[in-house]
């Protein structure tokens, strides 16, 4: 991972936003336009993967630091790298590149001070029936695997806000590199006894540019396998994940589904 831009001052950085960006040239500009003007946001880390103009666009913004991955990290890997590199002393936020909530509602989340992790329950403005059905099915399956998360109304919303110190503390538990990172993160906070608060907000789903919709079946299979992996990690059988045979099989599956 090579750091491309870091012209920002290190001190007094209260809030940083981490944006995982895989070929997001069509959407990243609008998102950075909205976030860089917010007085609460001191810096933005764009973790870039791919081969489009995303870094070139991001470099135009003074608050933005671009981290360019030398290999494919996946959304989870990009988020972990962003948290690791963040220097905020108060809060670290995670935001999808399509700006799924309004700047006003994002500011509302940043003002909440009585929780270690703030997650969003999506009130969808536009979503297909198929995606909604899959969303509900995934939520049910996740709760069967992790009963202590039965109260969670939504795992996959593309915006979360965390206390910076707590985010750093759970880093070594974040083992998922794909889209299941949200469940991994929430459960890591929950099992440590950190306070989690869920806020319902209007949510805009960008179906036209959604990478998930274009390979939905592969994503479903990969997330199901990652759910099993996460459950095994938090079980007496955790050692299986370090077996060479398991690692080799995992790499082959990921390659086949990518």
What are these regions (language model features)?
Residues 70-73, 77-85, 91, 103-179, ...:
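Acceptor/aglycone-binding surface of glycosyltransferases and processive sugar-polymer synthases
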Residues 26-30, 52-60:
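Acidic helix N-cap motif at the loop->helix transition within catalytic regions
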Residues 23-37:
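Short, well-formed alpha-helical segments that are part of the catalytic scaffolds
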Residues 13-15, 36-46, 63-64:
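Short loop->beta transition adjacent to catalytic acidic/histidine clusters or analogous donor-positioning motifs
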Residues 21, 47-49, 69:
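Conserved sequence signature across two-component system core domains
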Residues 47-55, 99:
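A conserved acidic beta->alpha catalytic loop
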Residues 1-12, 26, 173-258:
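Hydrophobic helical membrane-anchoring modules
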């Amino acid at each position: 991972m090579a750091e491309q831009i870091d012209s920002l001052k290190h001190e007094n950085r209260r809030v940083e936003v981490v944006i995982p960006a895989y070929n997001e040239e069509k959407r990243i500009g609008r998102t950075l336009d909205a976030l860089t003007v917010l007085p609460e946001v001191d810096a933005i880390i764009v973790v870039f993967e791919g081969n489009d103009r995303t870094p070139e666009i991001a470099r135009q913004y003074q608050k933005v630091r671009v981290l360019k991955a030398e290999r494919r990290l996946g959304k989870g890997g990009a988020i972990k790298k962003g948290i690791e590199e963040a220097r905020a002393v108060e809060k670290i936020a995670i935001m999808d590149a399509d700006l799924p909530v309004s700047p006003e509602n994002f500011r509302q989340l940043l003002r909440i001070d009585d929780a270690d992790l703030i997650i969003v329950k999506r009130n969808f403005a536009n979503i297909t029936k198929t995606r909604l059905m899959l969303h509900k099915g995934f939520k049910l399956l996740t709760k069967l695997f992790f009963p202590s998360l039965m109260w969670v109304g939504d795992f996959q919303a593309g915006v979360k806000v965390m206390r910076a110190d707590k985010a750093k503390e759970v880093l070594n538990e974040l083992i998922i590199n794909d889209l299941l990172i949200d469940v991994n993160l929430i459960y890591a906070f929950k099992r440590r006894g950190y306070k989690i608060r869920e806020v319902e907000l209007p949510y805009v789903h960008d179906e036209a540019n959604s990478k998930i919709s274009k390979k939905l079946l592969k994503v479903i299979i990969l997330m199901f396998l990652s759910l099993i992996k996460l459950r095994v990690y938090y079980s007496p059988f955790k050692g299986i994940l370090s077996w060479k045979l398991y690692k080799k099989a995992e790499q082959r599956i990921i390659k086949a589904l990518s």
